[in-house]
């Protein structure tokens, strides 16, 4: 692995009086799979939203592939120009827990829209890219379907295909199975496993403890807006920290 694909330094985020992210620093290397675990309200999703610039940080630095997206100046968090942010956006994709597909678009249109509007590629190239992804994810026969005609697992696979269509360097997953019935969870986890085998760099917020243990190079435990512990799966699952052990044990026994 070479260099850091993602670098976060001293990230801070508040909503009103509530300090949600408290001085978090995190780096992710090429090909690394990092899972983020922790109780609800610990700041996991906000961390992802700030890292992907859906939310603006109140302090800290953010860079992708050595390219600065935000930095601190005179005590304030300053973002690079809109044009630079748009270019940096091409480095990453985000898969939401509630799919976020356009309901009035077909599966194919959902996938080709961003490559054409964001990356500026031709419709022909976008469709070729989409067809390849649909075949890879077992959805070729659903290309003309609309989201309401799909199961939750199929919708989430389409949202993964949509994120991959921009050919990102990093994929973020925000609890990708939390909106799915248990029997549909496996088909989405299978896709993420396949991406890990292809050395896709991924940051995954998840409550699937066994999955995180099997797949991750590193696991981060967050609580109350801070990283309480990070390390290999074995280090986390055999943690000397009683709170980490309690959380993992409780979630795995649900």
Residue ranges of model-derived segments:
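ABC ATPase "signature
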Residues: 230-231
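Conserved ABC transporter NBD signature motif
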Residues: 60-74
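Catalytic Walker B motif of ABC-type/P-loop ATPase nucleotide-binding domains
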Residues: 171-174
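Conserved ABC ATPase signature
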Residues: 146-150, 154
